[in-house]
Amino acid sequence: MSDQFDAKAFLKTVTSQPGVYRMYDAGGTVIYVGKAKDLKKRLSSYFRSNLASRKTEALVAQIQQIDVTVTHTETEALLLEHNYIKLYQPRYNVLLRDDKSYPFIFLSGDTHPRLAMHRGAKHAKGEYFGPFPNGYAVRETLALLQKIFPIRQCENSVYRNRSRPCLQYQIGRCLGPCVEGLVSEEEYAQQVEYVRLFLSGKDDQVLTQLISRMETASQNLEFEEAARIRDQIQAVRRVTEKQFVSNTGDDLDVIGVAFDAGMACVHVLFIRQGKVLGSRSYFPKVPGGTELSEVVETFVGQFYLQGSQMRTLPGEILLDFNLSDKTLLADSLSELAGRKINVQTKPRGDRARYLKLARTNAATALTSKLSQQSTVHQRLTALASVLKLPEVKRMECFDISHTMGEQTVASCVVFDANGPLRAEYRRYNITGITPGDDYAAMNQVLRRRYGKAIDDSKIPDVILIDGGKGQLAQAKNVFAELDVSWDKNHPLLLGVAKGADRKAGLETLFFEPEGEGFSLPPDSPALHVIQHIRDESHDHAIGGHRKKRAKVKNTSSLETIEGIGPKRRQMLLKYMGGLQGLRNASVEEIAKVPGISQGLAEKIFWSLKH
């Protein structure tokens, strides 16, 4: 405990009501956030002679100030605690590093409903199925559904402005409701109902209805229709045979935990209508000395009580660990969801099987993560030895990408002790330079990146410049001219030139723009980490450049047409589904776009044709 913090005087002012407390260090930084049913009793426990753990001892030794917020109920305290944790990211709290919203499959409420992937708030009218663990799982499911039940997946702006069916209709992936006469209202509605049942886990009902329709078509001598329905039946059966399905058909999340070498993995299985939609592993940031019970309790609270997760609560949550506040958590989640949420820790039957699966996946993911970290650590240690540095905790690498000097993009990628830190990757659009001048581009991106205040923890130990002597000279000049408060001499600037024939393993490294460089053996772990970060930077730059080039390609031909400004250009591309759709459109179709007159439509039509 800080000598300047008077615990006895502070505790005299604390109430016995429920609430949340924030602990600050001498620098005014929040280092811990906690909740309590009885604030006075809970805070008093920090200042006893015998503390529960070394982590608590280290925490109390740094306390300079404590702020208290009283709440009406324990539920309010629980919610406020996790909001504060997300806001302050305190050093001594367990932190969930990934709180992104989960994607859903959206079936719209349009006259001719469409299927799409959806993230975020559910404002649009329609039905939502999920959550799925990631966007890939949704896209894979949508592609599968399109093959079995060919309902539309196009945007409404494209759908409303079509006069003839698109390629999806030609290859049998859409029934073509955009064009009158291609499919009856009854048939389209039937396919939509199949999708609804399928996504709700009612595969048996889908098969029963399809078999009945196939038999009817066969009896009516409609053999082509019967064969088409037969193919649908076989496709549905192939899908359902691949997946373990619980007999109960419940909605639940199953949370398994593994803990080793100071690292925790929490694995979540998403089960809806008895089907495993997918799973995801999380590696929360765990302060040293933290008990596993605190890891699980904090993770579950942050996972379900923060933002978008409150929208995806299942009816039941299975845990691999018995929580002391299990009842409070269940009551809080039920209150927020407006319905009963059960939290179970000792399931039987299928539920026990699910929990075992989650536990196994958590252990496997943790083993893989520790192995990866070990490899990264070995490589960074080897690099520090080669560069004669005490250690390398953080590296940043820069690369430039353009096409004949146009649409220049610079990338910055970041590695820490665990490898790529993708949340901190950045791209910079380079402007105001002579086209193709890579030196000026490097000069600009380095000034934008480092010519401002930087937190001490974000100052890299090594800055890698992809490009060799010339680019390294630019970096040296920039750092010599920087007027900043942080230690600009701390980062080591290292140039990397590609070898002969641009082959991996033949790179030359430079400490200075003048003089000879040096090379590392192809099997050197230090070289491997340099290659890894350089390749990441190169890929990140090219990805940004391609996006920028595609954007220009889609608009450049329209920019030359008099009377077409940014708003009209955007409207045309939106309603026509892109530049290709606009090129294929007739004058009458173009004239239907809001803000486009008949005369302007003719001008656009002939400009794009010639």
From Swiss-Prot:
CDD domains: GIY-YIG_UvrC_Cho. Residues 16-94 form the GIY-YIG domain. PROSITE patterns: GIY_YIG (PS50164), UVR (PS50151), UVRC (PS50165). Pfam families: GIY-YIG (PF01541), HHH_5 (PF14520), UVR (PF02151), UvrC_RNaseH (PF22920), UvrC_RNaseH_dom (PF08459). GO terms for molecular function: DNA binding; excinuclease ABC activity. Its main location: cytoplasm. The UvrABC repair system catalyzes the recognition and processing of DNA lesions. UvrC both incises the 5' and 3' sides of the lesion. The N-terminal half is responsible for the 3' incision and the C-terminal half is responsible for the 5' incision. Interacts with UvrB in an incision complex. This is UvrABC system protein C. It comes from Escherichia coli (strain UTI89 / UPEC).
